[in-house]
């Protein structure tokens, strides 16, 4: 049958919970939330709708060693997908209000995680296995670190780590550039 060639774009930022300083606990995950808010070319919450209109999907995740933004879309829109990833990674315009809104969302996410037996078990194993290592830190951070996180601290974190020399791009699929 007929099918449309699809491409997957993954942009990795080399910062995750294991590389955060103690007072930055959860900042990598916080960035994952904030970068989607708005960018120079995509005002408030328009990124997902734009990718969807192109027939694609976009998401992100934070891990111990990286934060990954990924897009799957028809290959003919590879340049549009790359533009969106560049906007997220290097041109985010999140605001003080965005920080406060996302704080509440992340704190609620923490509550939901405490209700999940699998998440609790994995955190227990991490705590036991990595007693003196940064891998012990929860990806979401701590209630204290998230509550006290300021707009300036998060903005500084973004500008420090969200740099071309601290990222890499993976492209899978068929596309012409």
Protein language model regions, located:
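His/Glu-rich zincin catalytic helix
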Residues: 1-46, 83, 155-177
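Charge-rich, well-structured scaffold segments of protease-associated domains
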Residues: 44-177
